[in-house]
């Protein structure tokens, strides 16, 4: 089994590319990695080059017609190089570059390299057709003029190395933390993500006899990053948001987020989209969060893991002051 470190990349759909580039760059402070007006699309580094990435695409632009959803998982380079063989042994087809004949990626025996990052990748499908990706950042200088090349081509002709990214980010966002996808069969998908990709089930949410409901899975261990999967027809959260992406921040920055968002003309929201003046706490994690909308209604979240034991018996969703009161009474640390 390939050991996934954390969610690396997520994609959302927007109406106006330039407006959204401005929002994610100027309001959230994300660093533009590359703009592709011919698609049209843009990719942002989250937390600095190589940490995690957000892609935004306009309605109707490629690749939104060719996939239900896309998730990227960061892995070690040595595991990535072994991924094609391991995927085939599990009955899954590894994929590389997209071509007119293979719009979801041509069959491959080796990774491909996105030279502008640079990073090596292998793509594959989950049981519902969500396009998944294993990705490993490369310790090389970006070479955007090369486009997308096979691993053997990159490895043969690229020798310049650097010790690190050298990026000084201006944003308090540390990394991409959470993404959600829709699935047809919840039990089947829990099995796939748990047994095939090695994720740990964090919590199951309101499953009905028909199998509707959802699950949240830890990636790379509790507190690293998280994937939410929801069956088609679930009433939550699919009806309250176009798409959801969570960004990990420090607790200090989270506590000032409602005020900072208001100063930028953005309304701070709770988990049920109600206006708030303080974070909310998901006690089963536990983590504190502040939600807000981007210009297209994508449901965004700042999140900070808390240094406490999970306390779901306090209620799954509390205000920050309620959680703090519980901690002062010794309830939030009763199992330490």
Where are these regions (language model features)?
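Core segments of cupin and vicinal oxygen chelate
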Residues: 2, 11-54, 171, 182-224
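Short glycine-enriched loop/turn motifs at secondary-structure junctions
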Residues: 4-6, 64-68, 115-116, 173-175, ...
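Hydrophobic adenine-recognition pocket in adenosine-nucleotide-binding enzymes
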Residues: 10, 71, 179, 245
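Vicinal oxygen chelate
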Residues: 15-18, 72-131, 138-140, 151-164, ...
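Short, charged/polar surface micro-motifs in flexible loops or helix N-caps
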Residues: 49-51, 62-64, 76-80, 222-224, ...
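Short glycine-/small-residue motifs
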Residues: 53, 133-134, 226, 299-302
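A short, polar/charged loop-to-alpha-helix boundary motif
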Residues: 139-153, 307-322
């Amino acid at each position: 089994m390939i050991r996934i470190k954390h969610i690396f990349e997520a994609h959302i759909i927007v109406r106006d590319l330039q407006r959204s580039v401005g929002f994610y760059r100027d309001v959230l402070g994300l660093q533009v990695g590359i703009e592709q007006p011919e698609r049209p699309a843009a990719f942002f580094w989250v937390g600095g080059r190589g940490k995690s990435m957000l892609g935004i695409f306009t309605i109707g632009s490629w690749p939104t017609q060719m996939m239900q959803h896309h998730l990227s998982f960061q892995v070690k380079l040595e595991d990535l190089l072994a991924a094609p063989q391991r995927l085939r042994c599990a009955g899954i087809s590894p994929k590389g570059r997209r071509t007119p004949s293979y719009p979801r990626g041509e069959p491959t025996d080796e990774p491909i390299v996105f030279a502008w990052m640079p990073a090596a990748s292998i793509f594959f499908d989950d049981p519902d057709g969500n396009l998944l990706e294993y990705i490993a950042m490369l310790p090389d200088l970006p070479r955007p003029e090369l486009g997308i090349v096979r691993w053997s081509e990159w490895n043969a002709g690229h020798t310049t190395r650097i010790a690190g990214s050298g990026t000084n980010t201006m944003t308090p966002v540390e990394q991409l933390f959470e993404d959600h996808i829709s699935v047809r069969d919840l039990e089947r998908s829990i099995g796939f993500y748990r047994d095939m990709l090695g994720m740990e089930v964090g919590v199951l949410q309101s499953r009905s006899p028909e199998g509707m409901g959802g699950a949240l899975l830890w990636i790379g261990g509790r507190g690293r990053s998280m994937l939410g999967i929801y069956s088609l027809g679930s009433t939550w959260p699919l009806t309250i948001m176009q798409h959801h992406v969570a960004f990990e921040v420090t607790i200090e920055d989270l506590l000032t987020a409602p005020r900072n968002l208001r100063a930028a003309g953005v309304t701070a929201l709770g988990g049920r989209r109600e206006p708030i003046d303080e974070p909310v706490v998901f006690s089963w994690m536990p983590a504190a969060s502040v939600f807000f909308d981007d210009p297209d209604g994508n449901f965004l979240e700042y999140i900070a893991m808390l240094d406490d034991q999970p306390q779901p018996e306090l209620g799954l969703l509390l205000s920050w002051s309620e959680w703090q009161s519980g901690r002062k009474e010794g309830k939030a640390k009763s199992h330490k």
